């Protein structure tokens, strides 16, 4: 029973010959190079680009064995590598089905007039040319503006230089006589101060007169400004005589000589 069941084929199973015939033949997988070649052929057929150069015709498939590999294989006596299916020669014209698909593709591209990808490729150079013209025009405008700005800046600098020259050529404003007199008074006071300071500088701390006591305040000279009495020839500090450095009199009498002069004492020095 088992032999009969195993030997007999079920009516539902199709025969083996039909299975082998129904399966389609295995096709070679498409690559990026095949797609690029197809696109270039379509564009060349439509007249958008020139036909491929001779270098593309001399293209060799990547599956071909290089001479270095053949030398290595001959040296090592290795068995021949398995031969891969060689792609069809690009110089051969495509089949009728491919031509029909290409024609339909080109007709669709022409009918759309700008919606397809090929129309973009066609309009690309034109649009790029217009954009280039627009960019050139904008650059020219910018250059003109820049030149105008430079000229304006040059004129501004020239005007500034002219203004400075005019300001330098104008005479200085004349001050009123009161201001000049005040300046003169200040100059005389400054001269007196410089004289007193010169006298102070002339006496150093190591000098013998530094510790000399001549004033009625019984304090040493110590480099402070002093004035001499015209009668008794006594040196008195300006601070003790209540005299400012800016207003030093030419003739000075100390307090003692003033009192003696009022009571009919000796005549002052230099008087008859």
Swiss-Prot record:
Sequence segments annotated as region (Disordered): 1-31, 50-193
Domain of life: Eukaryota
Family, similarity comment: Belongs to the PHF23 family.
Any one Gene Ontology BP term: positive regulation of protein ubiquitination
Cellular component, GO, one term: cytoplasm
Entry-linked PROSITE patterns: ZF_PHD_1 (PS01359)
Gene name for this UniProt entry: phf23-a
Zinc finger (PHD-type): 212-260
Species of origin: Xenopus laevis (African clawed frog)
Skewed-composition ranges (Pro residues): 79-93
Residue spans of biased composition, Basic residues class: 136-148
Name of the molecule in the record: PHD finger protein 23A
Record GO terms (molecular function): zinc ion binding
């Amino acid at each position: 029973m088992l032999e009969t069941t195993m030997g007999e084929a079920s009516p539902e199973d199709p025969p083996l010959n039909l299975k082998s015939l129904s399966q389609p033949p295995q096709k070679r997988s498409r690559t990026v190079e095949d797609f690029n070649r197809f696109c270039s052929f379509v564009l060349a057929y439509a007249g958008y680009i020139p036909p491929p150069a001779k270098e593309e015709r001399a293209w060799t498939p990547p599956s071909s064995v290089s001479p270095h590999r053949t030398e290595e294989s001959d040296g090592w006596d290795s068995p021949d590598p398995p031969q891969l299916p060689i792609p069809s020669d690009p110089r051969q014209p495509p089949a009728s089905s491919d031509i029909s698909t290409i024609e339909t593709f080109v007709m669709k591209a022409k009918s759309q007039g700008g919606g397809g990808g090929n129309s973009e490729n066609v309009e690309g150079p034109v649009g790029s040319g217009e954009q280039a013209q627009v960019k050139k025009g904008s650059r020219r405008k910018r250059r003109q503006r820049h030149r105008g700005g430079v000229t304006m800046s040059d004129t501004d600098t020239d005007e500034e230089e002219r203004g400075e020259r005019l300001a330098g050529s104008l005479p200085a404003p004349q001050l009123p006589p009161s201001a000049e007199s005040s300046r003169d008074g200040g100059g005389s006071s400054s001269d007196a101060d410089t004289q007193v300071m010169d006298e102070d500088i002339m006496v150093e701390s190591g000098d013998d007169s530094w510790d000399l006591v001549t004033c009625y305040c019984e304090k040493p000279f110590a480099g402070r400004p002093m004035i001499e009495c015209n009668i008794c020839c006594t040196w008195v500090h300006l601070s003790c005589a209540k005299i400012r450095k800016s207003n030093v009199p030419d003739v000075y009498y100390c307090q003692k000589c003033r009192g003696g002069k009022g009571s009919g004492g000796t005549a002052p020095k230099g008087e008859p």
